[in-house]
Amino acid sequence: MLNNEYKNSSLKIFSLKGNEALAQEVADQVGIELGKCSVKRFSDGEIQINIEESIRGCDVFIIQPTSYPVNLHLMELLIMIDACKRASAATINIVVPYYGYARQDRKARSRKPITAKLVANLIETAGATRMIALDLHAPQIQGFFDIPIDHLMGVPILAKHFKDDPNINPEECVVVSPDHGGVTRARKLADILKTPIAIIDKRRPRPNVAEVMNIVGEIEGRTAIIIDDIIDTAGTITLAAQALKDKGAKEVYACCTHPVLSGPAKERIENSAIKELIVTNSIHLDEDRKPSNTKELSVAGLIAQAIIRVYERESVSVLFD
């Protein structure tokens, strides 16, 4: 626990159904109890939210990743924002560890929607005054909002794990980006670990189907660490791991901030060349979706620090610079 000076303050933290364990951990780190609210569903599927304490004049923080089931968790968030606005909260700060629809951030083809922008519009219209996000799939999504966005990074948490692991020598590692779009992320991890980087050139013939083509960088004899922001069906990451093994990698580790792990992901990872998968708890991961070789790291401390700094009107940039 960081401190207990906020127990009788106007700081309120609420959790919806998206990741209650993470929200509780964040509240414990801040040193306050979670706010009292109920989230129920009517028989026809409609959501009913009731805030069970006064929040008039309070700085409210709502923790809710919009992960699976995405639409249900998004509606919970929008309804809670509206409830806080009508209950006269001073500020409504949403903490979104995982931003659903982030991969629909541009018009890849004619007549396609930009759903990431639509979600931003919905959040703002509902009444949110600030968003704390973690590793947005595309950083430019921040530009879809007219409210302040604090964009936290998961790379330092992942990097600390590899630096502290006695079985890994960073001097013998290479950080690998599974595609060209992830080079910036891979470079950040490589800078912290002081390792070289490599890039996998992949082609995706259709959604959720990836084909690894070739590898740019020195791999042979090194421990490869693949880093991505999201692992969904795990097609990309497992094909990348096998390609690295074929190129002479000694061992292959994989890491990501957001373990979506849908469909065949669990089976693919367990049967792949990946020795260990390191993820964060930005998304609640049921045991039946978690591969047996998974290590989960907590982002609660990072989020708790961000909440305290926002509440105290202090700079948040020290957390992601």
Swiss-Prot record:
InterPro entries: PRib_PP_synth_CS, Pribosyltran_N, PRibTrfase_dom, PRTase-like, Rib-P_diPkinase, Rib-P_diPkinase_bac
Reported cofactor(s): Mg(2+)
Pathway(s) served: Metabolic intermediate biosynthesis; 5-phospho-alpha-D-ribose 1-diphosphate biosynthesis; 5-phospho-alpha-D-ribose 1-diphosphate from D-ribose 5-phosphate (route I): step 1/1
EC number(s) stated in the UniProt entry for this protein: 2.7.6.1
Active site (UniProt): K202
Residues that, per the record, bind Mg(2+) 2: D179
Annotated localization: Cytoplasm
Subunit (UniProt): Homohexamer.
Function: Involved in the biosynthesis of the central metabolite phospho-alpha-D-ribosyl-1-pyrophosphate (PRPP) via the transfer of pyrophosphoryl group from ATP to 1-hydroxyl of ribose-5-phosphate (Rib-5-P).
Protein name: Ribose-phosphate pyrophosphokinase
Organism whose genome encodes this protein: Staphylococcus aureus (strain COL)
